[in-house]
Amino acid sequence: LGLSPAEPDTCLKTPRSGRKHVAWADPLSLAEVKVCARALRGTANDVLLCAAAGALQRHFLATGEATPECGVRVAVPFNLRPMRQPIETLGNQFGLVLVTLPVEETDPIMRFRQVQENMNRLKRSYQAQVTYSLLDLFGRGPDVLERRALSMLSNKASAVLTNVPGPKEPVYLAGAKLNQPMFWVPQSGNIGIGLSIFSY
């Protein structure tokens, strides 16, 4: 992770202005995403990451900027808490992994295969556990160490992308059903782009 080269300067890595712009897409059918995943012998997460790569590719084409030939790296929070473990205390338990999205690949099936291969490689690695331990260690030290660690990590990625599994049953607030909950993933360091996916 520390030996990974810094991300190249692209339209995704411009200096931050201090202002946020938000946008969201119409919801996708999770059932259809799962059908695609089964047909391609992958996971729903692979399908969604492939779609994110396609969206970033279209963004590069729309801005007229050359699409990076080696893909775009995104920082992805990787859950380290067992899914069936009861949650006794509030808080997150995740490590960050760097995922390369093949934005240069125009064939969607080939793009999917590359995403799938990248994700399978990460699942076999200890990158998430290492970053979790390092960030925990730096978080206990002086602020300057934590800021330097976050700065180093943020130089390795062009965006943050997270896929949060939501509740499997409808959620109600004061008797009103929540139809389309959404959230925005926080960014740190010099990362200005956040891609948030929520299953509900």
Predicted regions located by residue number:
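Soluble acyl-CoA-dependent acyltransferase catalytic core bearing the H(X)4D motif
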Residues: 1-191, 197-200
